[in-house]
Swiss-Prot record:
Residues 16-37 are annotated as: Disordered. Cell division protein that is part of the divisome complex and is recruited early to the Z-ring. Probably stimulates Z-ring formation, perhaps through the cross-linking of FtsZ protofilaments. Its function overlaps with FtsA. This is Cell division protein SepF 1. GO terms for biological process: division septum assembly; FtsZ-dependent cytokinesis. GO terms for cellular component: cytoplasm. Homodimer. Interacts with FtsZ. Its main location: cytoplasm. It is found in: Cytoplasm. Pfam families: SepF. The gene is sepF1. Keywords: Cell cycle, Cell division, Cytoplasm, Septation. It comes from Streptomyces coelicolor (strain ATCC BAA-471 / A3(2) / M145).
Amino acid sequence: MGSVRKASAWLGLVDDNNDDERYYDDDYSEGPESGDAWVTDPRVKVASDVAEEKGRRIATVTPDSFRDARAIGELFRDGVPVIVNLTAMEGTDAKRVVDFAAGLIFGLRGSIERVSTRVFLLSPADTQVISGESAAHRSDGFFNQS
C-alpha cells in the first residue's frame, strides 16, 4: 500500500482494505519442486569449454589486397593464431599487411614468426609455439631480417 493511500485510510477518506490479503502463502510450497529436472540444451556450452576450444583453432588467411587485413585483425583479436599467406599479393600491399600484423602483435602482446617466404604466423600472447629447428639454425627473430 502506498504512503498516500495509507494516509488517506488513516484520515478515513478511503476504505482501509488490506490489499496484502489477496496473496496467499498456500499457493507456494516450501522445499524442492517436484517434476522433471531441467535439461541444458546440448548446443549450449560452458564458458570454460569454449575457452579450451579456442586454443585448438588456427586460421589461415590468404589476402588478395590490404582490405583483407581486417579479417586478420579480427581473428587475432579474438585470440586465434593466424597464418598469413602473402604469396598472392603484390609486394607493396604485402608490406602494408606485414606492417599491420606487426602493429597487431605489438598492441596485443603477441608474436610473429616467419614460416616461409611471404608466410607468417601471428600468435596471441597466450599461445606457445614449439619450433622443430635447433637453436643454432634459429635466427634472431622476425625483426632482425637485415
